[in-house]
Amino acid sequence: MKVTVQRIPFLKSLEIAASIVASRPQNEVLRYVKFDADSKTLQATDNELSIVCNVADAVQYVASPGKALLLPAKVIPILKDCGGESVDIEVDSQLRITTQSGGFTLSMPNPDEFPSVKIDASENKAGVPGVALADAIRQTIYATDTESTRYQLGGVLFEIGDRLTCVATDGRRLAVSKCQLAGEVPAVSGIIPVRPLQAVSRIIAAEGCGVSMVIDNKSAVFVCGDISLQTRLVEGRFPDWRKVLPSTDQSATLKCDAEKFLSV
């Protein structure tokens, strides 16, 4: 494999893909991000959470196709510090990176050892503005319970209907946030783990675009621009949170001093 890429766009995508790499993976090969010159994608996974970044716009020239495994801890500093607009990435028995400031040779596992990462979000996509989704995540994720054995409370419940409803609780606190959806999709729900939602928030901040979501019985997919992220759902049944809320049509408005209220 021998490919020339634009340094800054490729680096940006590599940093996003590397953000989901587990610090202590069960399989050593999962410490790497796979660069597939055939599909022009970067792929990373921990077998629970997977990401695919389309880097076609960053690939300038493919002299010979193939695959490379990039160790983020080593490749990212090289791309940050080397300067120049373009970088050559080549694989023979080793990974070779040629930059404006010099060449680097790194060892890497066989790319064929990396698990296949395929993300399909072609059907029943629900669209939501990126800012609205990021706000909904921020307003609920703090109320999750990630430390107890009640695994169903370790994520945020996503209910898709005429709008998106996000719910989280740790048994003491209950947080609910709602936002509008674009288009009509079948009603569906699933519990999304905390770590994937943190990754989605980072992607929205980096890409600044809308998000398409697909939830099925076992997984959820989020697509933002050139980035697709797939996660397994949390198993278990989420509590009937609507029974916790007061069932009354009466409403009241309470005004208070924000500074004093927050100091209580």
Per-segment meaning from a language model:
Residues 1-264:
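Structural preference for solvent-exposed beta-strand-turn elements
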